[in-house]
């Protein structure tokens, strides 16, 4: 029997809580909002990690910097990555003088069944995000979910329902929301320092391409069938998809997992980096609860670039930034402009300048966004990148890819 994504969600996310919270694909996916008591966890919050690649390692290092958090468990379909993860986290805690013995679970389901784990980091490939996140929410866990939040628009609607009907906290891994430079740029836009915003330029890269990698030998200890889940069977293994590692001698991944660049397995740069930049753009102009009203692919209706149009008149395009040439966002208003990336900040008005403090280390290891998640777990109030925002950002990204694929403009009908 062929597996589609809707049936996949229903069959993989239901068991642990007894009742499935998924419903029909209608509206914006909001369910009844239920809240738990403040700080039901005690002094230490126990965290498990699912999907143990490069991104998860960086994110987890950020979580180890939070004093009331302990990473206690992990799961992955690749055994060597489990071993590497355990060794890395145990070593970090040992240097802090903290006893640690991270448990490896045979599956994410087994990890979620442990009532002593309060929250999970989910950093799998995109096509597993929704199913595992919904299972975690049903199991009573709070969730830190890597971006892009979901693989499809439908999944985002169902994830909103799961969060709200279970009364859980979900933080999307859009770390730029907790970055002081991006926060400053957003504040300047929202305070009208640039006047009325007329145009946004966001640089993040191209949509995905069809899967065309040749087959290579499967590394020992990788369960490729489980990795695939609902994906087409013709997506055979290639070293770039889940890069093999070595523990002795130590050999890291030779690249980021290439699944993100192919339309069968990911959303290309549009969702990979667009999830960051579109998120900041929509936040700044007050559209992160609504999204665009029209998306136009390059070469259609006179559009030179992939274009998003908002009902407040703002036009956003995916194109190179004039000053920095890095992935980032440029806001152009009646009174001037601001251009911000993860390393640079430029503006036409020196009074609006922001000077970055270089703290060293990998960008993803900075703990501010993870601290925001933990703070929300304790307060039971929404974090700064909640599920609805993640859904609207993902929707804008996916609409960009759909418009590119069908080669005509897409307009919102409500």
Residue map of PLM features:
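Sec-exported extracytoplasmic/periplasmic mature domains
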Residues: 64, 87-91, 164, 190, ...
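Contiguous beta-strand/loop segments that form the cofactor/metal-binding neighborhood of enzyme cores
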Residues: 184, 196, 201-388, 392-414
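A contiguous active-site-proximal alpha/beta segment in oxidoreductase catalytic domains
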Residues: 142, 150-226
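Conserved G/P- and acidic residue-centered "switch" motifs that form tight phosphate/ATP-binding loops
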Residues: 147, 192, 380
